[in-house]
């Protein structure tokens, strides 16, 4: 899988974000019976200030968040809890942004290793790029089951 990572905050240098992203993305695509070699994703590794600006611009929420995603195309199913349409996907799946301070704070508050939490958020963001969401209870249940299963492949405990 081709992953283009832009490090926009120095805190990220302490983590192997490239390795975490590669493992998380390959596990996600493989779990969904997709060939990781067919796809690409871009990741912006930023700070809370940058992601708050993006969150304001794209979601109208002037606060930091852990991860934002921008799918390259709309793949969401019409039926709540249904699988998105995963055939004929564009090679470029979309873009993610991760905020270091928010991710680190959430990991510490949850007693989770930061790399495990980052892996979870990459899986979560990639699933959004593939058309999954958590707008309804049925959608959230499907997405959480997938995340838990994919993270188990990576040796990451159930985040829920």
Swiss-Prot record:
Function in brief: Single strand-specific metallo-endoribonuclease involved in late-stage 70S ribosome quality control and in maturation of the 3' terminus of the 16S rRNA.
GO process terms (BP): rRNA processing
Annotated InterPro entries: MetalPrtase_cat_dom_sf_prd, YbeY
Record NCBIfam families: rRNA maturation RNase YbeY
Molecular function terms, GO-annotated: metalloendopeptidase activity; RNA endonuclease activity; zinc ion binding
Alphabetically ordered keywords of this record: Cytoplasm, Endonuclease, Hydrolase, Metal-binding, Nuclease, Ribosome biogenesis, rRNA processing, Zinc
Pfam families, A to Z: YbeY
Protein name per UniProt: Endoribonuclease YbeY
């Amino acid at each position: 899988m081709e992953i283009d990572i832009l490090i926009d905050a120095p805190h990220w240098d302490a983590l192997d974000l490239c390795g975490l992203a590669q493992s998380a993305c390959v596990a996600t695509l493989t779990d969904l019976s997709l060939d990781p070699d067919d796809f690409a994703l871009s990741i912006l590794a930023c700070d809370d200030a940058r992601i708050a600006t993006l969150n304001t611009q794209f979601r109208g929420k002037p606060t930091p968040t852990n991860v934002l995603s921008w799918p390259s195309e709309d793949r969401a199913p019409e039926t709540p809890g249904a699988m998105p349409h995963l055939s004929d996907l564009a090679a470029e799946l979309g873009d993610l942004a991760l905020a270091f301070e928010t991710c680190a704070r959430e990991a510490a508050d949850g007693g989770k290793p930061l790399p495990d939490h980052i892996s979870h958020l990459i899986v979560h963001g990639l699933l959004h790029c593939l058309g999954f969401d958590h707008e309804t209870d049925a959608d959230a249940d499907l997405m959480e089951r997938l995340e838990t299963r994919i993270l188990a492949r990576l040796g990451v405990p159930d985040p829920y």
